[in-house]
Amino acid sequence: MASEELFEAEFSEEQDLEHQQAMETEEAELAETEEPLEITEESPDNPEAESTTEQLTEKPVTNGNKAPADNEAKMTQLPLARIRNIMKLDPDLHMANNEAVFIVAKAVELFIASLSRESYTYTAQSKKKTIQKRDVDMAISAVDSLLFLDGAMNF
């Protein structure tokens, strides 16, 4: 199982674009249509349900400056501040905006997931449940796209 097959099957940019477009259209539809909700209550005096219409206003989802930053922080499992600090260690990089840090964080998460899947195949072959260093080494040597990590596990 090569990592290229995993990326083609699960991580397509077209799916992301379609999902993003669907979310934007849903937000636009919700913002345009605010309908009153009917709440029916039964009273002890009247056994039949009385219909009352109440106007309930919901706060529409806005694309403010704080909302995306909060959502981005919640969507990643790695700390964005630490990734920003690691990125700043590069002398060619002067500034990194939030979007760049978020993209790098997501890319690192996908890379770690791919490496762990490849490593787990060797763990499962040896009938173990815990991924060990030798499993990661075997995955690195077996998958062509991971060969750049050869020797990185020697510490």
Curated annotation (Swiss-Prot):
Acidic residues biased stretches: 1-16, 24-48
Annotated InterPro entries: CBFA_NFYB_domain, Histone-fold, Transcr_DNA_Rep_Reg
Cellular component, GO annotation: epsilon DNA polymerase complex; nucleus
Keyword Nucleus applies: yes
GO molecular function ontology, one term from the record: protein heterodimerization activity
Pfam families tied to this protein: CBFD_NFYB_HMF (PF00808)
Consequence of gene loss (knockout): RNAi-mediated knockdown results in an atrophied wing phenotype characterized by increased induction of cell proliferation in wing disks but failed cell cycle progression.
Cell compartments where the protein resides: Nucleus
Keywords recorded for this protein, A-Z: Nucleus
Record SUPFAM superfamilies: Histone-fold
GO biological process: DNA-templated DNA replication
Binding partners and assembly: Component of the DNA polymerase epsilon complex consisting of four subunits: the catalytic subunit PolE1/DNApol-epsilon255 and the accessory subunits PolE2/DNApol-epsilon58, Chrac-14/DNApolE3 and PolE4/Mes4.
PANTHER family: DNA POLYMERASE EPSILON SUBUNIT 4 (PTHR10252:SF79), HISTONE-LIKE TRANSCRIPTION FACTOR CCAAT-RELATED (PTHR10252)
Descriptive protein name: DNA polymerase epsilon subunit 4
Species: Drosophila melanogaster
